[in-house]
């Protein structure tokens, strides 16, 4: 009897592997737990080809997402500056602060592209002026734009 059996995982299992991974496990673990519960299948050449095809499709999808994010970055950095108008008090201090939602709304108004406010990082803004904002469009793509806070 074989000491280890190769299994392709259908689901992520803690301390074993992720979906689509080829892992070697004890025959009893595969026969009595993984296969009956649908968590894995015995690795055959056909199954391995299917897993490889899925992996290639996933890589293509991830590359397409990154390319789209790069295009959005170029578009945002071409515009470069977004203006946010706020009510101003003494010494050019604004009432309240500039929020990430306001920046997202300004970007959407200028580009017709919606942004998730959680991907925007701003310094603390309490006065009028120019500030740098970083917009995370993808885990590997970050656009830097200028935010101008102007009096209303």
Swiss-Prot record:
Superkingdom assignment: Bacteria
Family: Belongs to the bacterial ribosomal protein bL9 family.
Any Gene Ontology CC annotation: cytosolic large ribosomal subunit
GO annotation (BP), single: translation
MF GO annotations: rRNA binding; structural constituent of ribosome
One Pfam family this sequence matches: Ribosomal_L9_N
Role description: Binds to the 23S rRNA.
Source species of the chain: Synechocystis sp. (strain ATCC 27184 / PCC 6803 / Kazusa)
HAMAP family in the cross-refs: Ribosomal_bL9
Presence of the UniProt keyword tRNA-binding in the record: no
Gene it is expressed from: rplI
Name assigned to this protein: Large ribosomal subunit protein bL9
Keywords assigned: Ribonucleoprotein, Ribosomal protein, RNA-binding, rRNA-binding
Keyword Ribosomal protein set for record: yes
């Amino acid at each position: 009897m074989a000491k280890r059996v190769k299994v392709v995982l259908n689901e992520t299992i803690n301390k074993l592997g992720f979906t689509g991974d080829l892992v070697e496990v004890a025959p009893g673990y595969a026969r009595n737990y993984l296969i009956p519960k649908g968590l894995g299948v015995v690795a055959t050449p056909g199954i391995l080809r299917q897993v490889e095809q899925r992996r290639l499709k996933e890589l293509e999808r991830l590359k397409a997402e990154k390319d789209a994010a790069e295009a959005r970055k170029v578009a945002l950095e071409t515009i470069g500056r977004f203006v946010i108008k706020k009510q101003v008090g003494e010494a050019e201090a604004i009432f309240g602060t500039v929020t990430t939602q306001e920046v997202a709304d300004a970007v959407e108004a200028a580009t017709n592209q919606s942004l998730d406010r959680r991907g925007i990082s701003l310094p603390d803004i309490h006065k009028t002026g120019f500030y740098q904002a970083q917009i995370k469009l993808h885990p590997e793509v970050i656009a830097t734009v200028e935010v101008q806070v102007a009096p209303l």
